[in-house]
C-alpha cells in the first residue's frame, strides 16, 4: 500500500467505502440486486484504495469468447436498470473530479474521481484489478487479436 492510498483512505476512502458497503448490503437483500451488490463491493474496494488499480470490463479481462451470453445479457439488463442511479453518482464523481483538478495538488484526486465515475455508470461486468493485471490482460488480448 502506497502513501497516496494511505492518505486517500484516511481522508476520503473510509467514508466512501462504508457508504458503498451499506449500498451493497441494501442491494443484496433482493435476489435481483445481488449482481449490483457484487459490483458495489468492487467499487468499495476501489474507493478505499484507488491508486494502483484499474477498472476494466470482464470481457477485456477474460476475453469475449470466455464470457457466456447469459452473463452478457444479464449484465446489459442490470446495467440498464442501474443507469438512472449510476448517471447521478457518475456525474457527482465527475463534478468532484473537476473541482479537484482546479488545484495542482488535487490532480491525482481528480483522476481517481474520474476513474470512479467510469465504474459507476455501468458497474455490472466491471472489475477492479491492479495496474499490472490490466496491462497483462491488454497484452494477451492484443496478441490473440493479431493471431486471428
Regions found by a protein language model. Name each.
Residues 1-44, 68-101, 112:
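Alpha-helical membrane-anchoring segments
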Residues 24-65, 96-141:
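Membrane-interface alpha-helices
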Residues 141-148:
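Long, low-complexity, intrinsically disordered cytosolic termini of multi-pass membrane proteins
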Amino acid at each position: 500500500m502506497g502513501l497516496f492510498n494511505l492518505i486517500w483512505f484516511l481522508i476520503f476512502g473510509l467514508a466512501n467505502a462504508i457508504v458503498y458497503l451499506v449500498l451493497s448490503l441494501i442491494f443484496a437483500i433482493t435476489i435481483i440486486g445481488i449482481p449490483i451488490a457484487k459490483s458495489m463491493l468492487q467499487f468499495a474496494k476501489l474507493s478505499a484504495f484507488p491508486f494502483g488499480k484499474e477498472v476494466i470490463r470482464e470481457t477485456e479481462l477474460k476475453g469475449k469468447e470466455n464470457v457466456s451470453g447469459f452473463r452478457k445479457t444479464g449484465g446489459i439488463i442490470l446495467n440498464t436498470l442501474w443507469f438512472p442511479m449510476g448517471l447521478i453518482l457518475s456525474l457527482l464523481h465527475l463534478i468532484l473530479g473537476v473541482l479537484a483538478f482546479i488545484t495542482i495538488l488535487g490532480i491525482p484526486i481528480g483522476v481517481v474521481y474520474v476513474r470512479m465515475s467510469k465504474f459507476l455508470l455501468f458497474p455490472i461486468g466491471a472489475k477492479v484489478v491492479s495496474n499490472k493485471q490490466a496491462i497483462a490482460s491488454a497484452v494477451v488480448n492484443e496478441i490473440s487479436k493479431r493471431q486471428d
